[in-house]
Amino acid sequence: MARSRVPAAASPAKLGPLLSRRFFARSVHEVAPELIGATLLVAGVGGLIVEVEAYHHTDPAAHSYGGETPRNRVMFGPPGFAYVYRSYGIHWCVNFVCEAEGSASAVLIRALAPTHGLGVMRKHRGLDDERSLCSGPGKLTQALGITIAHNGAPLDIEPFAIHRRTVEPDIGTGPRIGISKAIELPWRYGLRRSRLVSKPFK
């Protein structure tokens, strides 16, 4: 099958079927690349997922590596729920819990190509530059209005809606960003040639 490149920024198009929680009940390394090109909406605002990172419970960089705590409890729950935490005490990050309950594995959503509700995103972010609206995990949560109130929310019930991708993207892999452990693991997945990813893929 010929690959079609998902654009770095796109206009609203026909959405694919909604993903159910069962989609996430698989290896985090299967789920993560399949999220590239999917559309994430929160209360109708969002865009195409262009960059993610996988975190497994055996991974020293994962929040769950040291065991269950009040902060990471959602990671230890069933798949298909949002795990939201504050990074460096500054901004929120949103993850999708994967694998069987107790596995404590998740996919961090790093970047989106805005497609829906750009006016709302611009208001939330206080800027007009479309490229800067969702080009980072903290930026996209601010743009979509994601906060700790969304922690533990099911991903297949409003305000969340995740639509399966409708084209096969050209996916790149590489080391994850901003971590100090397991830095050699190529567990970052993203849309190759996108200008919105944290670091270009080779």
Curated annotation (Swiss-Prot):
Which biological process terms from the Gene Ontology are attached to this UniProt entry?
base-excision repair
Q: Please give the InterPro entries that the UniProt record associates with this protein.
A: Formyl_transferase-like_C_sf, MPG, MPG_sf
CDD domains, per this entry?
Answer: AAG
- Origin organism is Rhodopseudomonas palustris (strain BisB5)
Please report the name of this protein according to its UniProt entry.
Putative 3-methyladenine DNA glycosylase
Q: What's the top EC group for this one?
A: hydrolase
Q: What is its EC number?
A: 3.2.2.-
Which GO molecular function annotations are given, in alphabetical order? alkylbase DNA N-glycosylase activity; DNA binding
Question: Is Transferase one of the keywords?
Answer: no
Q: Which family does it belong to?
A: Belongs to the DNA glycosylase MPG family.
Keywords, A to Z, come to: DNA damage, DNA repair, Hydrolase
